[in-house]
Amino acid sequence: MTLLLLSGCATQSAEKTYRQITMEEAITMMEEETGYIILDVRTAQEYSEKHIPGAINIANESIGTEDISELPDKDQLILVYCRSGNRSKQASEKLVKLGYTNIIEIGGI
């Protein structure tokens, strides 16, 4: 009986979340890793003015409750950024809720 009670306490699942790193850490990661996506969640106009080379643009406002065709692999490493860090945090939270498992928020550029 005691064993059953104790095993029930250990079944709580960890809350799904994203990681935050600095831009410097992200630069190092981009130099060392492969197979990642850089996601710019600013507006299309902001993206057209300046963006990290190789980044794809999906505006934070367009990330909702449906799967994103541009991001088919929910386990792929995705580095998320915006201008100041606010929208990248919001987008990262939404991506986690959509089931993405490897989100890293790198703030603003």
Regions found by a protein language model. Name each.
Residues 68-109:
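Catalytic cysteine-centered active loop of the rhodanese-like fold, especially the PTP/DSP P-loop
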